[in-house]
UniProtKB/Swiss-Prot annotation:
The chain crosses the membrane at residues 14-34, 38-58, 81-101. GO terms for molecular function: mechanosensitive monoatomic ion channel activity. It comes from Agrobacterium fabrum (strain C58 / ATCC 33970). It is a multi-pass membrane protein. NCBIfam families: mscL, PRK00567.1-4, PRK13952.1. It is found in: Cell inner membrane. Keywords: Cell inner membrane, Cell membrane, Ion channel, Ion transport, Membrane, Transmembrane, Transmembrane helix, Transport. Channel that opens in response to stretch forces in the membrane lipid bilayer. May participate in the regulation of osmotic pressure changes within the cell. Belongs to the MscL family. This is Large-conductance mechanosensitive channel. One of its GO terms (cellular component) is plasma membrane. InterPro entries: Mechanosensitive_channel_CS, MS_channel, MSC/AndL, MscL_channel. Pfam families: MscL (PF01741).
Length: 142
């Protein structure tokens, strides 16, 4: 059973998946930083200097706080600001992945085109095949 497990782990697909998950986790942190530290402050400046993550709607009448943390202590709130931040984060990540896939597909297409261009022309058919083709064509015309 141990040998079977070693074979399973040593397969390329499992290793590729492990590397992908690790890189994805690190990449997610980069995107979070880009959104929270670079994009959201600009969006906040454009829309009057506010922070989306602090936006909420009170769901109970005793919530009258102005910050999300204080409002959560007072009662139930609908914290849609954090959702907006996460949504923007997702859209940026999806856009970056789209651009990466598009680039890889373009590279793959150019490699495939080069392979097609590099293929030598097909060898001319042998004389007997040419003769049989001519006979077939003559029989079709009759």
């Amino acid at each position: 059973m141990l040998n079977e497990f070693k074979t399973f782990i040593a397969r390329g697909n499992v290793m590729d998946l492990a590397v992908g998950v690790i890189i994805g986790a690190a990449f997610s942190k980069i995107v979070d930083s880009v959104v929270n530290d670079l994009i959201m402050p600009i969006v906040g400046a454009i829309f009057g200097g506010f922070d989306f993550s602090n936006y909420f709607l009170p769901l109970s009448s005793n919530v009258n706080a102005t910050s999300l943390a204080a409002a959560r202590e007072q009662g139930a709130v609908f914290a849609y600001g954090n959702f907006l931040t996460v949504l923007i984060n997702f859209l940026i990540l999806a856009w970056i992945i789209f651009l990466m896939v598009k680039g890889v597909n373009k590279l793959r297409d150019s490699v495939d085109r080069k392979k097609i261009e590099e293929k030598p022309d097909a060898a001319p058919p042998p004389e007997d095949v040419k003769l049989l083709t001519e006979i077939r064509d003559l029989l079709k015309t009759r």
